[in-house]
């Protein structure tokens, strides 16, 4: 069901105080109803470190990552910052996930859109991002497969191919790999394409999917 692995909020602002309010809101619900899950506000990792320092109930530390140093720099992170965030998450000893306190999002095309792919193809860059993720023992690694738009994944067929490629490479690396099955409104794709990809990933043994209404993430 929805929320088995994490209940997440994509915030409208990176304001630290607002992030703390959202974390406390979700924690109150989880504690009240004794839900065996984790919460996460999908804010920048440096903000999560700040909320932790202020005593916020942080279960999972979120960050978007890429497969080259330049891509990660465009996201405002490097391996040192991710290591600091990982240690901060471990120090809280919360949730039900042991030492798996990181939640990473990836997606084909991010390195190309940042002009940080150094001539590599989208899938090679994506697989390299999974190697970054694996270093930090994540609970979740999530490819947001269609978010990049038709400039990089043109239509439903390309989004479907990318989703299956990402799932395959995640499995090869032994990651807790999942998929946010989604598409942009200006891509040559529709809800049927997303439902087809959902079915294919289910048959392929995908660990989890993001339950977004209308696949409109």
Regions found by a protein language model. Give the residues of each.
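Anaerobic metallocofactor- and corrinoid-dependent redox/one-carbon enzyme cores
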Residues: 1-217
């Amino acid at each position: 069901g929805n929320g088995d692995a994490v209940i997440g909020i994509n915030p409208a602002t990176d304001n630290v105080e607002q992030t703390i309010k959202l974390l406390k809101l979700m924690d109150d619900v989880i504690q009240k109803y004794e839900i065996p899950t984790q919460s996460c506000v999908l804010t920048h990792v440096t903000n999560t470190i700040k909320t932790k320092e202020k005593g916020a109930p942080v279960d999972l530390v979120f960050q978007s990552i890429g497969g080259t140093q330049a891509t990660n720099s465009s996201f405002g992170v490097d391996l040192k910052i991710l290591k600091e965030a990982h240690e901060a998450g471990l120090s809280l000893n919360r949730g039900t996930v042991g030492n798996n306190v990181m939640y990473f999002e990836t997606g084909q095309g991010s390195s190309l859109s940042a002009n940080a792919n150094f001539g590599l193809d989208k899938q090679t860059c994506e697989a390299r991002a999974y190697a970054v993720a694996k270093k930090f023992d994540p609970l979740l690694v999530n490819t947001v497969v269609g978010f990049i738009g038709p400039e990089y994944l043109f239509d439903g067929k390309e989004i479907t191919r990318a989703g299956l490629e990402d799932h395959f490479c995640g499995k090869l690396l032994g990651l807790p790999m999942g998929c946010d099955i989604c598409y942009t409104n200006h891509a040559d794709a529709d809800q049927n394409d997303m439902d087809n990809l959902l079915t294919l990933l289910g048959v392929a043994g995908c660990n989890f999917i993001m339950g977004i209404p209308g696949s409109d993430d």
